[in-house]
């Protein structure tokens, strides 16, 4: 895995991890700069075991960081996913397609990946819900965001149209 976009971004992710650990998160893997890569914006991919009330569960990271929160059941998982002012993307891992489809329908997120993390396709609309995205980009729906539609009808000639007003002028105006 390559470096982050900048050392500033790496430092921001380090602060997020430090805050999570301060709140009681367990670092399952990663959580620091690689010792052999001292130059640049490198940060190890990190998995944190967290609780729902931790700050990290209510913000966006945009770094190599995955907070994992154990849940009792699908109802709790959906409730936790929706307990956020954000809604860009959600990842679901399951072999139970009935549960997957239920979660896809109930999670308030603009993107949902099921067993296929972060795959993307430029032909599919991309965007979030809530505070992470009004509107869409990419795909046909994304193009529609830049379009202003207008209805225009043009008759090829200026002749009266019997389908629109099928009465001769003499019948219509000599009543």
Give residue spans per PLM region.
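Short beta-strand to alpha-helix junction loop
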Residues: 3-14
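General beta-strand structural signal in soluble alpha/beta enzymes
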Residues: 27-30, 114-116
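Conserved C-terminal structural/oligomerization subdomain of aldehyde/semialdehyde dehydrogenase
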Residues: 35, 42-175
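Short intrinsically disordered, low-complexity coil segments enriched in acidic
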Residues: 1-3, 154
């Amino acid at each position: 895995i390559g470096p982050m976009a900048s050392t500033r971004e790496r430092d921001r992710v380090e602060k997020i991890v430090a805050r999570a650990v301060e709140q009681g998160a367990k670092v399952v893997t990663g959580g620091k700069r690689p010792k052999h890569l001292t130059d640049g914006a490198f940060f190890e991919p990190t998995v944190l075991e967290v609780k729902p009330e931790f700050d990290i569960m209510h913000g966006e990271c945009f770094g190599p960081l995955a907070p994992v929160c154990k849940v009792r059941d699908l109802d709790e998982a959906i409730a936790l996913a929706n307990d956020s002012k954000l809604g860009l993307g959600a990842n679901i891992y399951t072999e139970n397609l009935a549960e997957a489809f239920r979660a896809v329908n109930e999670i308030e997120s603009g993107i949902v990946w099921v067993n296929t993390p972060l795959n993307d396709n430029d032909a599919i609309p991309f965007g979030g819900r809530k505070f992470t995205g009004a509107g869409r980009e990419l795909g046909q729906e994304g193009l529609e965001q830049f379009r202003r539609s207008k209805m225009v009808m043009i008759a090829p000639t200026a002749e009266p149209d019997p389908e629109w007003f099928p009465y001769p002028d003499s019948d219509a105006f000599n009543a």
